[in-house]
Amino acid sequence: MQGRLSSWLVKHGLIHRSLGFDYQGIETLQIKPEDWHSIAVILYVYGYNYLRSQCAYDVAPGGLLASVYHLTRLEYGIDQPEEVCIKIFVARKNPRIPSIFWVWKSADFQEKESYDMLGISYDNHPRLRRILMPESWIGWPLRKDYIAPNFYEIQDAH
């Protein structure tokens, strides 16, 4: 079953895959990384003017990484705004996704956090860098195949 947005994307020849609906009835769509930036601009023009959240996760050890976007269509006088969830899957060997910072500025720190924790590189992000881990940190702590470094902090006994 396709939702309203999925039907609209099909009507306009925009390639995607419907992943169904969540428990709240919010449609989830899968977009290819190479199509993401152009579809993001189209969604913004279509009325999805608010990036509610962006997060990322490791699908399986040695498997794909996912970047997830929750978009909302805010309009004056509407009690129940329309929402959509977008998922983009990338290979962990070279995880690159176009940044949507230039579409929704609120993606700034969210994309930085996904980079810092999972190593997903957001192309054309103006200041992509680590924000939680030290710049010298090696590896991506939230990947399921991450091996924690074996170090101990020595503290004073006083």
Curated annotation (Swiss-Prot):
How does this protein lie in the membrane? Peripheral membrane protein
Single GO biological process annotation from the record: photosynthesis, light reaction
Q: Where in the cell is it found?
A: Plastid, Chloroplast thylakoid membrane
Enzyme category, top tier: translocase
A GO MF annotation of the entry reads:
quinone binding
Pfam families associated with the record? Complex1_30kDa
Gene Ontology terms, cellular component aspect?
chloroplast thylakoid membrane
Which keywords appear in this protein's UniProt record, sorted alphabetically? Chloroplast, Membrane, NAD, NADP, Plastid, Plastoquinone, Quinone, Thylakoid, Translocase, Transport
Q: What does this protein do?
A: NDH shuttles electrons from NAD(P)H:plastoquinone, via FMN and iron-sulfur (Fe-S) centers, to quinones in the photosynthetic chain and possibly in a chloroplast respiratory chain. The immediate electron acceptor for the enzyme in this species is believed to be plastoquinone. Couples the redox reaction to proton translocation, and thus conserves the redox energy in a proton gradient.
How is the subunit organization of this protein annotated in UniProt? Answer: NDH is composed of at least 16 different subunits, 5 of which are encoded in the nucleus.
The entry assigns this protein to a family as follows: Belongs to the complex I 30 kDa subunit family.
NCBIfam families attached to this UniProt entry:
PRK12494.1
What protein does this entry describe? NAD(P)H-quinone oxidoreductase subunit J, chloroplastic
Please report the organism this UniProt entry assigns to the protein.
Glycine max (Soybean)
* Taxonomic path: Eukaryota, Viridiplantae, Streptophyta, Embryophyta, Tracheophyta
